């Protein structure tokens, strides 16, 4: 008990230390900073993003992730005097998806910011150092593809050698996810372990050729493996995940230095070493997956002394697949059905062919060698992209905690020897986990979820048997939050997908959401989407709930915002109104055309709470109880604006904001409207929800 209390106290102490080094103030513009670029900048086409050690005017130091939308050059090691808009790391909060606060805390990111127009160079950067070396390697890889014919292959080589994930275009990441291969292109424990094994194997071969063996050959082999792991981790930028991987391997090597040791004892020692070095590792999904899968391998393979290597490999792949069924299903709400088979082939190919070629081409920048590696990488990616297009995914709804615990137990039972007779029960429990469905919405009622889409919009409307999604949010929001949350909500089919208008914060996630089967696409600008129909005035009813597309009177010279679809949903007398980015002129046109029929208890404010929408006349006509502003935390547009907030409150309307509360839920029915946050709890280190 004393050890447990000491460990808990140590974890709290380290967490408080990490929190104290984060930017705690709200968004502040024009902050004078002296920054040193500490890692290779990465570009996504819109901006250049780089990690920097920043010192403010008070002498306080922060590790910031800065963005420059002017896309200027920021040499590694250079120091600058800049002004920036800085704010804490606060991400979206949905049913499932990336937790940016946990990611920032576990990776040592103290805040994010946007660089201003002016900058003064204080120091041009040194010509040596790991970061500079990595930058040169990346440049050498780019120069190896003079004609640009192997751009994707070169990008993969850069990702595998120096950890430059931004070298891969976004479309490739979307291909890796349904195949369950994202872990292969972001340097992690798998890569570091494979390089360690490669170095250890080379050391063993060299020692075998030596006329005189050292006193402790095992120690030399283990030391070579650890040295290889450290070398690769440094080459990849020595990020926090790679640091943990090196430490884990060092712990394994230390445990094995004197001969055979219990696999479980080694596992526990490695886990203790990682948590002692960095207690915040528990916030990273990778830690749970890494140690969980290794534990599954030990559980399945330990004690089977008489099996051949092939049988052991098959059993190991089976164990990893079974436990992944539970872990991936719960964490990501999705199961790539072809993942076990694809991983069985891809892991050896990436580990023993592509990664060694990437390392060799980095150390020996010989153009033909680099081009050969890039050629293999290019056609590997082309095959995987094709495979991703034809590979299905299985959505897994968010199961309650007791069912999750039972599913983990079932996975372990399934890995036990056949003679125990427990496998049929394990299969039944796992089937219950993957087929779980949340409680259905009652007839004549509607459940509305306004997802936390950052500076975007996405609204899910559910009835007893139907689902409608209004807008998809941005590309990033859809991939990291909305699609996983739709899966977790049990949405396997969208009966209607509505795209209010052609704007990246409303339809940017169309490609990601579009992979979910749908019964039809309706849009304010249907010409931009294949097979889409216009959201002209029409009414329909699902499960006793009335839906209606409203349309302003015809106007001339309407911009894209003015073409937004307008949706009204009525269930048992309670109503929801969503207007996309409709401006005040469009709102006034709706008032003139529909008058009091616009009355709705829940109004999603137009244009995220911009001054261009939510006029007083419109608020009077709608007369809502709740007004929802779907906007990003500390967004550059300051949505919802002070003017809109004051106008809403002056009408006696309760304002709810996704940037402060995360995703919001509303129940519409005969009892009126029930409103609540989707996530009502938070850990003590979390900022969001603020309210």
Curated annotation (Swiss-Prot):
SUPFAM superfamilies linked to this entry: Metallo-hydrolase/oxidoreductase
Positions of transmembrane segments: 183-203, 220-240, 280-300, 322-342, 347-367, 396-416
Keyword Protease attributed: no
Keyword hit for Cell membrane: yes
Pfam short name (any one): Lactamase_B
Principal subcellular localisation of the protein: membrane
GO terms under biological process: establishment of competence for transformation
Localisation per UniProt entry: Cell inner membrane
Gene Ontology cellular component list: plasma membrane
Membrane topology: Multi-pass membrane protein
UniProt KW keywords: Cell inner membrane, Cell membrane, Competence, Membrane, Transmembrane, Transmembrane helix, Transport
Annotated function: Essential for natural transformation. Could be a transporter involved in DNA uptake.
Family, similarity comment: To B.subtilis ComEC, H.influenzae REC2, and E.coli YcaI.
Protein name: Competence protein ComA
Native organism: Neisseria gonorrhoeae
Taxonomic placement: Bacteria, Pseudomonadati, Pseudomonadota, Betaproteobacteria, Neisseriales
Gene that this sequence comes from: comA
């Amino acid at each position: 008990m004393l050890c447990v209390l000491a460990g808990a106290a140590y974890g709290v102490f380290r967490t408080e230390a990490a929190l104290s080094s984060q930017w705690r103030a709200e968004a502040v513009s024009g902050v004078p900073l002296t920054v040193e670029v500490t890692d290779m900048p990465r570009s996504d086409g819109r901006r250049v993003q780089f990690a920097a050690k920043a010192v403010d005017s008070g002498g306080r130091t922060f590790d910031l992730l800065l963005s420059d939308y002017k896309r200027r050059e920021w040499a590694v090691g250079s120091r600058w005097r800049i002004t920036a808009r800085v704010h804490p790391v606060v991400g979206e909060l949905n049913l499932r998806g990336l937790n940016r606060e946990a990611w920032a805390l576990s990776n040592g990111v103290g805040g994010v910011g946007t660089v201003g127009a002016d900058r003064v160079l204080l120091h041009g950067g040194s010509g040596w150092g790991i970061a500079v070396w990595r930058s040169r390697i990346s440049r050498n890889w780019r120069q190896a593809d003079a004609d640009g014919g192997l751009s994707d292959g070169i990008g993969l080589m850069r990702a595998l050698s120096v950890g430059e994930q931004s070298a891969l275009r976004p479309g490739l990441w979307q291909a890796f996810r349904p195949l369950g291969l994202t872990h292969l292109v972001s340097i992690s424990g798998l890569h570091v372990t494979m390089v360690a094994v490669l170095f250890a194997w080379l050391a063993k071969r060299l020692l075998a050729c030596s006329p005189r063996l050292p006193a402790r050959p095992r120690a030399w082999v283990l030391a070579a493996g650890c040295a290889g792991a450290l070398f690769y981790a440094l080459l990849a930028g020595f990020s926090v995940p790679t640091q943990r991987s090196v430490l884990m391997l060092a712990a394994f090597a230390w445990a094995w230095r004197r001969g055979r040791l219990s696999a479980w004892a080694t596992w526990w020692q490695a886990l203790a070493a990682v948590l002692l070095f960095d207690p915040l590792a528990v916030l990273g999904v990778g830690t749970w997956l890494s140690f969980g899968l290794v534990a599954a391998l030990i559980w399945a393979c330990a004690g089977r002394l008489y099996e051949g290597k092939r049988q052991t490999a098959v059993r190991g792949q089976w164990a990893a697949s079974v436990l992944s069924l539970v872990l991936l299903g719960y964490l990501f709400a999705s199961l790539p059905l072809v993942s076990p088979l694809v991983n069985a082939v891809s892991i050896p190919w990436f580990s023993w062919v592509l990664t060694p070629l990437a390392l060799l081409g980095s150390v020996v920048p010989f153009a033909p060698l680099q081009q050969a590696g890039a050629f293999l990488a290019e056609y590997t990616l082309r095959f995987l992209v094709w495979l991703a297009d034809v590979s299905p995914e299985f959505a897994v709804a968010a199961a309650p905690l007791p069912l999750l615990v039972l599913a983990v137990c079932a996975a372990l039972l399934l890995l036990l020897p056949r003679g125990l007779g427990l496998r049929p029960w394990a299969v039944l429990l796992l089937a219950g986990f993957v087929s779980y469905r949340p409680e259905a919405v009652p007839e004549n009622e509607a459940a509305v979820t306004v997802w936390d889409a950052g500076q975007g919009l996405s609204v899910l409307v559910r009835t007893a048997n139907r689902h409608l999604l209004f807008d998809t949010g941005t590309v990033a929001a859809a991939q990291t939050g909305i699609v996983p949350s739709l899966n977790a909500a049990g949405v396997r089919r969208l009966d209607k997908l509505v795209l209010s208008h052609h704007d990246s914060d409303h339809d940017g996630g169309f490609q990601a959401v579009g992979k979910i089967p749908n019964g039809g696409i309706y849009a304010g600008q249907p010409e931009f989407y294949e097979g889409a129909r216009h959201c002209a005035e029409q009414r329909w009813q699902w499960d006793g709930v009335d839906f209606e597309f409203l349309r302003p009177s015809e106007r001339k010279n309407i911009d894209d915002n003015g073409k937004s679809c307008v949706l009204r949903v009525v269930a048992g007398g309670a109503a929801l109104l969503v207007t996309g980015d409709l401006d005040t002129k469009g709102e006034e046109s709706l008032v003139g055309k529909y008058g009091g029929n616009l009355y709705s208890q829940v109004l999603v404010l137009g244009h995220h709470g911009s001054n261009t929408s939510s006029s007083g006349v419109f608020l009077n006509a709608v007369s809502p109880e709740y007004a929802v502003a779907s906007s990003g935390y500390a967004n550059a547009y300051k949505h919802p604006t002070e003017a809109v907030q004051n106008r809403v409150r002056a009408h006696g309307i309760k304002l709810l904001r996704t940037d402060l509360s995360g995703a919001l839920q509303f129940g519409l029915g005969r009892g009126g409207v029930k409103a609540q946050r989707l996530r009502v709890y938070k850990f003590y280190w979390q900022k969001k929800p603020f309210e």
